[in-house]
Swiss-Prot record:
Alphabetized UniProt keyword annotations: Cell membrane, Membrane, Nitrate assimilation, Symport, Transmembrane, Transmembrane helix, Transport
Chief location of this protein within or outside the cell: membrane
Source organism of the structure: Arabidopsis thaliana (Mouse-ear cress)
Membrane topology, from the record: Multi-pass membrane protein
Protein name as annotated: Protein NRT1/ PTR FAMILY 2.12
Keyword Cell membrane: yes
Record-linked InterPro entries: MFS_trans_sf (IPR036259), POT_fam (IPR000109), PTR2_symporter_CS (IPR018456)
Purpose: Low-affinity proton-dependent nitrate transporter. Not involved in dipeptides transport. Involved in delivering nitrate for seed development.
Localisation: Cell membrane
Disruption phenotype: Aberrant embryo development and increased seed abortion. Reduced seed nitrate content.
GO biological process: cellular response to nitrogen levels; embryo development ending in seed dormancy; nitrate assimilation; nitrate transmembrane transport; oligopeptide transport; seed development; suspensor development
Amino acid sequence: MGVVENRKILPEKKLGGWRAITFILGNETLEKLGSIGVSANFMLYLRNVFHMEPVEAFNVYYLWMGLTNFAPLLGALISDAYIGRFKTIAYASLFSILGLMTVTLTACLPQLHPPPCNNPHPDECDDPNKLQLGILFLGLGFLSIGSGGIRPCSIPFGVDQFDQRTEQGLKGVASFFNWYYLTLTMVLIFSHTVVVYLQTVSWVIGFSIPTSLMACAVVLFFVGMRFYVYVKPEGSVFSGIARVIVAARKKRDLKISLVDDGTEEYYEPPVKPGVLSKLPLTDQFKFLDKAAVILDGDLTSEGVPANKWRLCSIQEVEEVKCLIRVVPVWSAGIISIVAMTTQATFMVFQATKMDRHMGPHFEIPAASITVISYITIGIWVPIYEHLLVPFLWRMRKFRVTLLQRMGIGIVFAILSMFTAGFVEGVRRTRATEMTQMSVFWLALPLILMGLCESFNFIGLIEFFNSQFPEHMRSIANSLFPLSFAAANYLSSLLVTTVHKVSGTKDHPDWLNKDLDRGKLDYFYYLIAVLGVVNLVYFWYCAHRYQYKAGSQIEDFNEEKSLLDIEPNQRHDQSPS
């Protein structure tokens, strides 16, 4: 989508403003309560109800999560190019409610799950049959389709309700973001505490409540229809990227100078109305510049391209370069997500082996232990933004840049995995001595992982949004879930490989179904070592990164390291 000035709003419609946002935020909050409420404890559902081994349950869960995080890229394409954001959210919401109903039925109907088993080892119980697995996977597929439509469109659809040409509209957008992330944090905490607790009491109740909330979300979304602003689709930026690549390939035999000396004539029309960033021609990825070189027959008598798949503007070429430059930094964030998702998953199994009592009458649900990370984020982010950043600026005239924040987050991920390995080693030793370890020992790695998310993931989102032109923000907002998709698939591959190669006839594998016989701490150490290698790779990418021309954030060039940044080069950067 283009920026506001290019929006094609139906003339009889007024800007929705906060009347519309009330329905959009209500829908988004209830939808997330439904989807997260099911996924938060789903590993234990696969383990205890469908009797899957830990590795099998891990693979099913993360293959589903990978599909769920990849789907928003397709959802953004369909929304921008074909049906618009409202219809995308509407259709996706129906798929989400259908998916939740299907998963709930697998818990309600005895024909749709294996018979209950009181054996303390679920792997010795009856396996699910093909029909039961098929119904379960069908429900998960519906949920992935729903997430693919809702995630990439909910924030842009909310922004559409404000006129950003006015000061009031800009303030409304800023306030909308604050409310959006506040409600998301509340949903995460509620889902990992109240909903998870209800699921320990009854899976039927624990799944029925998220399903009911999702149904309320769908109703609320349609009730607000008369208040919404509807922006027509104007075509996807993906087609522009494809045109640049095709045009450059068609002119691959063209010889151009490495330095712009005026011998080539480039196509540089006036930028479209409302485009705030006019990108100059850069000296990176010169092979793409061929797409903008004007040859005989490329222009019509009116001065426009005769074939848009043969001639592109400098602006279009530079937009593709922005994407190419970001990819290495994007890839460096995947290992940290692998660490986070792997730790959160296996810690649920660890918690089942530990003392979870708070007082004589209450036992903490195993899946609720991960809420410590969210609490850490909620405490640390305000401290960082309102205390630490102003303090560093007053004392040293120093601000932590986005890439530095991401690097610090990677370090915290490494420390978290080393700490998790140490805690698991102590837990397993005590288990052999027939003594249980308090579950609150897991708070140490979870707090460190919460700090990783506060630095790395928030910095990554800001980085993506600062390094793309305005109308490419849909790509920027798709890259983050796409990194989770890549991490989910990599996690599944890593777990499967370690499970197969780490065991022998005389020694169980590291990820044995019985944690007391396995070596989960070794697996944590392996991911920590991968994190160290990834930190070196990230430093190299950050060291060589060239910021988008005109960007106010220029904290790296080929002669500056991760920590060697002069304050006067950051004076225009807002605290982050």
